[in-house]
């Protein structure tokens, strides 16, 4: 397949490029012109910017967007996060206005779900907090592409755990925190399984049967971890954990990602036969 990855220079994007490279032709879009010449991709990967002529492709994986954990979540930052994602969708509609690819995968988040003691599948109820509203706007932007006669996957990612970025990188130079009352369940997925799950959707699309022109897919491990268990997974070498009151996570909206409490199940991936590593 010919696959375009937007946001391919990021934490997840680089892992996905490496995973697809041996069996697919990969194109990477980056909106940062300063990054274009510094990407260390193999010569077989074509890097595109907004000024490029976009090649015909079979599928797009949209990972593009400003990182949530970059700085404090002010009102302007939240607007910037949303706009950065919707801008890429708008650009893709312009570039492929006459021949849109048949598969479009939009990176989303499990933060859309309401806290629950029950197991949540892709049909889970939505929360009403600002994260859920943010995710809903992004998903609606992707679903607008249904008018282009393409199939849309909404990939709802849990916290992605990998050594090269995300929560592991943020904790790298800090002692491992241990939160009092940190027994809330956090959906998570390893970076390796994240990339493999995207690859699985691309390669198994023709084998799946659907009753609608889009599919929600939970990207999270099938086992559940509490907040403190997740932090231990992220810093297994840390022998000492520093007790912390949970209220400090409420001081910044980014901390709300670790305050959720829901057991999200990757029902679609499991049903289709995906094997977690």
Feature annotation, model-predicted:
Residues 2, 204-252:
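Mid/C-terminal beta-alpha module of Rossmann-like enzyme folds, strongest
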Residues 3-22:
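N-terminal Rossmann NAD(P)H-binding glycine-rich loop of SDR-like oxidoreductase domains
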Residues 35, 40-87, 91:
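NAD(P)H-binding glycine-rich loop region in Rossmannoid oxidoreductase-like domains
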Residues 89-129:
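Conserved Rossmann-fold NAD(P)-dependent oxidoreductase catalytic core, especially the SDR/UDP-sugar
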Residues 140-163:
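Conserved beta-loop-beta element that borders a ligand/cofactor-binding pocket
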Residues 170-193:
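A conserved pocket-lining segment of Rossmann-fold NAD(P)-dependent short-chain dehydrogenase/reductase
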Residues 239-240, 256-277:
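C-terminal amphipathic/interface module of NAD(P)-dependent oxidoreductases
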């Amino acid at each position: 397949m010919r696959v375009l990855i937007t946001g391919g220079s990021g934490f997840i994007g680089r892992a996905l490029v490496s995973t697809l490279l041996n069996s697919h032709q990969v194109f990477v879009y980056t909106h940062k012109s300063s990054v274009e010449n510094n990407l260390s991709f193999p010569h077989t990967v074509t890097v595109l910017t907004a000024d490029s002529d976009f090649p015909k492709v079979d599928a797009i994986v949209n990972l593009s967007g400003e990182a949530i954990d970059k700085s404090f979540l002010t009102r302007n930052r939240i607007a910037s996060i949303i706009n950065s994602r919707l801008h890429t969708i708008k650009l893709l509609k312009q570039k492929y206005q006459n021949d849109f690819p048949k598969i479009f995968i939009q990176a989303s988040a499990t933060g859309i779900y309401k806290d629950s003691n029950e197991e949540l599948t892709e049909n889970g109820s939505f929360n009403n907090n600002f994260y859920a509203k943010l995710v809903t706007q992004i998903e609606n932007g992707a679903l607008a592409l249904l008018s282009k006669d393409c199939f849309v996957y909404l990939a709802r990612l849990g916290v992605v755990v990998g050594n090269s970025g995300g929560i592991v990188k943020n904790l790298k130079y800090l002692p491992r925190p241990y939160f009092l009352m940190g027994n809330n369940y956090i959906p998570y997925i390893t970076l390796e399984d994240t990339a493999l799950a995207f690859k699985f959707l691309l390669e198994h699309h023709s084998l799946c049967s659907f009753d609608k022109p889009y599919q929600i897919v939970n990207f999270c491990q099938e086992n559940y971890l509490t907040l403190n268990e997740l932090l231990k997974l992220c810093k297994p070498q840390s022998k000492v954990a520093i007790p912390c009151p949970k209220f400090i996570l409420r001081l910044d909206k980014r901390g709300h990602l670790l305050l959720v409490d829901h057991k999200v199940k990757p029902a679609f991936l499991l049903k289709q036969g995906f094997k977690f590593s």
